[in-house]
């Protein structure tokens, strides 16, 4: 009887995977999710802020940003700040959140700071009752990463890299078993590449200005090397510098970091397109955890006391995503919608009924 039961279970599991393979209509086999901590929609869609780009209280050297970032036309300014976003993403993908067109993207949560924002992106819903601080507490909610990691096709093929040392708790590394490299974690294992060894050494020698957040080059190069070495099917990369430079009131460093992150994302995308496992089979989604204020003072901060801090943005590119460019239609979206969207792009149903609906425009 036990053997018959086990045999039936194996048959059902195998049958479900065969059925999924036969009915799947999407081309997406891999997902890369990238978050860009605390980057405002204002810079994304309008470039450098005219109030701050040459303010001596927010930049180190007067006039130092004008050559690289300033132009009277905001469409030109945004290209200077984000050349990859406003070339490849704008021509082949989708960008949401330009409120000048009534195209609104908001947090579902009402906290408007990092842990609640990341929980929302990764689990598909806000949980303001339990996720209401940035404390290092394991997330009680199951993220889309963890759901995928439980499925045989993705087991051991889910990886996450983050600059902030709270990500092992947000993703609940302990419960999920997902490989998470965050904060000041080093690459580990007996088969480290020369790149990993070098990044390990440099991370220990170059600490950066913050206690709980490493500089983004380390996060980026660990993730880039993982693509080449481990070929994950599901990859999450969380860049963090922009938020910390903003908290420090350094608008010049905020802009330079934003531009560098655009270059990092270009490198990730071009690396994916050069690999047969990923080319034409990978969707990349980019968003942020929260917005910021709009004045010279409130720009440094976010949270429920800052009215604009729940205003965010998102973008996507991939084989199943229509190339709509910058969306200029009126509408309301939330970052909570991305978890179910990712599952639909993979041809799967999201298992948590609490999750927000998918972004229907992101899938053909």
Roles of regions detected by a PLM:
Residues 22-27, 151, 165-176, 270-280, ...:
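Membrane-interface soluble catalytic domains
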Residues 123-137, 177-211:
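Acidic, His- and aromatic-enriched active-site or binding-groove loops in soluble protein domains
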Residues 173-175, 221-267:
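Active-site His/acidic residue clusters
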Residues 31-35, 42-43, 96-99, 120-122, ...:
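Structural recognition of the beta-strand scaffold that forms the well-ordered cores
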Residues 1-27:
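Bacterial Sec-dependent N-terminal signal peptides
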Residues 32-33, 41, 260-300, 342:
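Metal-dependent active-site segment of extracytoplasmic phospho-/sulfohydrolases and closely related
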Residues 42, 46-111:
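Short, structured active-site-proximal loop/turn typified by the sulfatase FGly-forming signature C/S-X-P-X-R
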Residues 42-48, 100-101, 132-134, 161, ...:
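Short, solvent-exposed loop/turn and secondary-structure capping segments
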